[in-house]
Amino acid sequence: MRRFALGLAFCGALLVGGCSSSGDAVDSSDVGGARTINGIVVEAGAELPGVNLSGADLSGAYLVGINLAGADLTGANLSGADLSGANFLDANLYQANLSGANLNIAYLHRADLVDANMSGADLTGADLSGTFLLNTNLRDANLTGADLSRSNRTTADFTGATMPDGTKHP
């Protein structure tokens, strides 16, 4: 069994959890069909608006339809995670690692993705309107049908990405 130490930022943030005020290590396992991420039970579709998950390792997590509106995910590792249909409205994903993540039809309106790594991410049909994509790595990402209107993407790297209209960026 993997063990993770939890910081106080996670305490009380989720519907079911295993944190203590001392930050003791918590086991990772499956509980009643839910997924355990960093020792905290999180189900797909969980409501976690405004939660502080900065620096969290959520790589490979199954978090379909999760609500992380206004959440702080600064420097979080979400690589390879299934975040399809997730809500990241106004979320802070500064320097987050979303490489290879599934973000199909995710709602990222006004999210801060400055310096984020989204290489190889699947953003098919995602709403990225009004996002901050400064220095964001979107190499080889799939943006087919995505909404990039009003996004600040002047320094984003789209090398090899499939653009919203289905064309390949050079």
Show which residues each predicted segment covers.
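Tandem repeat scaffolds
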Residues: 21-170
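C-terminal motif of bacterial Sec signal peptides marking the signal peptidase cleavage site
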Residues: 15-18
